[in-house]
Every structure is written in C-alpha cells, then in structure tokens.
A protein has these predicted regions:
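Non-catalytic DNA-recognition/assembly elements of restriction-modification systems
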Residues: 8-31
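Short, hydrophobic/aromatic alpha-helical segments in well-folded domains
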Residues: 7, 113, 178-181
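Accessory (non-catalytic) regions of SAM-dependent nucleic-acid methyltransferases
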Residues: 1-11, 82
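A generic secondary-structure signal for well-formed alpha-helical elements
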Residues: 28, 87, 91, 183-186, ...
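Amphipathic alpha-helical segments
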Residues: 15-19, 129, 160-191
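DNA target-recognition domains and sequence-specific DNA-contacting regions of bacterial/archaeal
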Residues: 25-163
Length: 193
C-alpha cells in the first residue's frame, strides 16, 4: 500500500469530502480601469494572460506594467493565489489555472482577462488545488460551464458552484509531492530529448 493510500485510509475512512469552489476560497476578478496595458511607464505591475495560460506555476519575474485609474481600489495578488483564464477562442482554453508559488512583490495586480481564487488556509494547499484544476476530470466539468459562439467565456456562478475534492491537508501534501516529482521528471526527460 502506498503512502497516499495509507493516508486516505487513515484520514478519510468515509471518503473524501467535496465542496463547491466558492466554499474553499475567495474568487476575485482582474484589474479594472485600465487605460494603457503594456505601458513601460505604468503605475502598476500585473500578471498577464499568457503567463497564466503557459505555466503551471506563475513566473513572477519581469512582469509587465499597466496604467490604471485608482490603483488603490484593486485586488492585490499574494503567494498562493490561483489564477484562471476567463475567456478564449476555444472552450478548452477557458479556466486554465496557474498558481503563484514563488514569493511575490507587494502591489502586483491581475490582468483584466483573468480571475483568481485565494484558497482559505483551513482548506489547504493551493498547489494541490491547482493540480486538480488542471486535471482531466475538472476540465470536463469546466467545459460544461463555458458559454459562447465565437469567443468563449466561463460562467462565474457556474464555476463557483463546481464541486471539488477537499481531502485533509496531509493527503493534499502527499499528492503535491507525487505530482511535483512527476512534473520535475517529465521536464528532465523532455529536456534530454
């Protein structure tokens, strides 16, 4: 029996609990009042759509600048926040997630084409949730909430009500350990090809 199986047997004898996304954290939107995105002389730095879409974990280096009205009225990002694409040309590219694992500077904002969730500490490890949000099971449930004809977007109320597994923290941490190892090995093998 694997360590993960032992933890599940010990800590979840009646099965893993499921909760709606809105129950496990605070959902927030990207910046508003943008007057000039990609402005070298902007008044704020932000995490852009491509950064979230392309990476399992956000790259916090060399972030672009934007100019926005009322920068003090914006949701400021923190380490542990999970970011999602809110719209795309295809349904499969909506709600692609990425987590901020690295220490992030104060005052960094979120692109207006993204939204995020801040997982409450009592519900666990943001990296676990990010791996789940990238899973095939979750992607299938997300696709049922996507709307559109030529441009597709995620329905926020439907997204917030999606049920996700919330195992105890030791189970989450073991899952993250396994998946981080797998991700690292995959990257090494890919680099050697």
């Amino acid at each position: 029996m694997s360590r993960l199986e032992e933890l599940i047997k010990e800590l979840c004898p009646d099965g893993i609990e499921y909760r709606s996304i809105s129950e496990v954290g605070t959902i927030f939107k990207g910046m508003s009042g943008v007057t000039n995105k990609w402005a070298d002389d902007g008044n704020c730095r932000f995490i852009d759509y491509k950064n979230a879409y392309d990476h399992l974990k956000i790259d916090v280096h060399d972030l672009p600048f934007a100019t926005i009205r009322k920068p003090e009225n914006q949701f400021v990002l923190q380490t542990g926040d999970i970011l999602f694409t809110s719209a795309s040309e295809t349904p499969d590219e909506c709600a692609i997630s990425s987590v901020i694992e690295a220490k992030i500077e104060d005052g960094i904002l979120l692109d207006d084409h993204l939204f995020g969730i801040r997982i409450s500490k009592k519900h666990g490890n943001p990296t676990y949730f990010n791996y789940y949000f990238r899973s095939e099971v979750f992607r299938k449930s997300v696709n049922k909430t996507v709307r559109g004809v030529t441009r597709f977007y995620i329905s926020m109320p439907s997204f917030a009500s999606l049920q996700i597994p919330v195992p105890p923290l030791p189970v989450q941490e073991e899952i993250v350990r396994i998946l981080d190892s797998f991700t690292e090995l995959t990257a090494e093998l890919t680099a050697e090809l």
